[in-house]
Each structure stands twice: as C-alpha cells, then as structure tokens.
Amino acid sequence: MEKRDELYRGKAKSVFKTDDADRLILLFRNDTSAFDGKRIEQLDRKGMVNNKFNAFIMQKLEEAGVPTQFDKLLGDNECLVKKLDMIPVECVVRNYAAGSLVKRLGVEEGIKLEPSTFELFLKNDEKGDPFINESHVVAFGWGTAEQLVEMKKLSLKVNEVLSKLFDDAGLLLVDFKLEFGVFHGQIVLGDEFSPDGCRLWDKETRKKMDKDRFRQGLGDVIEAYEEVAKRLGVPL
C-alpha cells in the first residue's frame, strides 16, 4: 500500500491518500488539544498509544457485529482504514453525568443515567460543535432519517459491548463520542475510539483516566492512557 498526499490534518490525526481509492492511512500524532484547539501540547507516546488502543477497540467491535472503517495496523502510529463519506454529526452516549451535560443542565457530576442518553452534535469547530436534534440533521441535509436510525442503533450497540469490556477491567465508561460515515452504501463507524474521545473512571476510586486529565490539568495523561490499555490487555 503506497502512502500518498496528505488529505486532511486534524487536531490529533493526519489522513493520507493511498494508491487504493477506497483506502486511507490514519497517522496518530502526539498533538493533544482541548477547548476546540485553543490549547495544544505534545505528549510523548500519545500517538502510538491511541493508534494501538483504537485498533484493539475497533477489532472488538467488529467481532461484536459493528462495522468499522478499521482495516489493519501499519506501524506504531499508523493504520489503514476504509475511505468513508463522513456524516458531519457526532453521536454521544452518556452513562453517567459529566462534561457538557453537567454544565448544560446543572446536574451533579457522576449521577448514573438510566437509561443511557443519546445526543447529537454538529461537527463544527468554529461553532463549538453545537447540540442539535434529529430534525436538524434531516432538514439541513447532514444525514437521512434512515441513517440516523442506524447510527443510534450502532451507538447503543457500541455502548453495550464496551461498557462490559471496561467494567471487566475495573473501569466505568462514563460517556463517549462516535462518528459515522458511508462506505458503499453502508453506515460504518469511523474516526477513532481512544481515551481522547471518551470518559473513563476507575470503578473504585472514580479517578479520571481519560483526556479530562489534560483538560483539567491533572497531569499524568499518558500514564493514565497506558494504565487503561494495560487493564484491557492492549499490546503497546
């Protein structure tokens, strides 16, 4: 597989074309950002940890019947993925109150949500990824009603699979965001799943083991990521 021109450079990953029109290469960088890119730092080993963590999770989801864009690891910081026509919407599943939900509704952090909530946000950094609903997605042509049904179904399936996986590792899956795209007519899970895009707390101590350590200046960010990977059995 030949790596060609950079197609897109995000806050923490770069996307490259290949000699296969249906495949791309994702490069996980050490860049770490918060507050819509207003704060950016370099954290050693982060790209490697997130790349291998993502590969492990995507393979677990594939085994559970969730279609993903992941194909294979290419190295410490790179993986091969399917080229998706991305839907510009973030799907957020919450099992416990945290983050923007606490700020928006004034509820106490850590409350268990029963049932888990499902939310949609427009993927737009300039607008701060605003909270939207299903009718916005259809009315503005960001996706179809049928695609939304499938995205919600897959998001809840991901929650079912990963909540158990993390629970078995002594961790609470507090919340997470997913992005989806279309590959040859099928809705497929895209982007990545790593501690950058979810909240994970130790079951016993409620210690934060995710990107909130960076956002809140708690320190030991990569050490926490590596501890999560170790508990799950991710080979680093």
Swiss-Prot record:
The yes or no answer to whether the keyword Ligase is present is yes
Q: Which PROSITE patterns match?
A: SAICAR_SYNTHETASE_1, SAICAR_SYNTHETASE_2
Give a GO molecular function annotation for the protein: ATP binding
Pathway membership, UniProt = Purine metabolism; IMP biosynthesis via de novo pathway; 5-amino-1-(5-phospho-D-ribosyl)imidazole-4-carboxamide from 5-amino-1-(5-phospho-D-ribosyl)imidazole-4-carboxylate: step 1/2
Q: Which CDD domains match?
A: SAICAR_synt_PurC
This protein's GO cellular component annotations are: cytosol
Cystine pairs: none
Q: What class of enzyme is it?
A: ligase
What is one GO biological process annotated to this record? 'de novo' IMP biosynthetic process
Q: Which reaction does it catalyse?
A: 5-amino-1-(5-phospho-D-ribosyl)imidazole-4-carboxylate + L-aspartate + ATP = (2S)-2-[5-amino-1-(5-phospho-beta-D-ribosyl)imidazole-4-carboxamido]succinate + ADP + phosphate + 2 H(+)
Protein name in UniProt? Phosphoribosylaminoimidazole-succinocarboxamide synthase
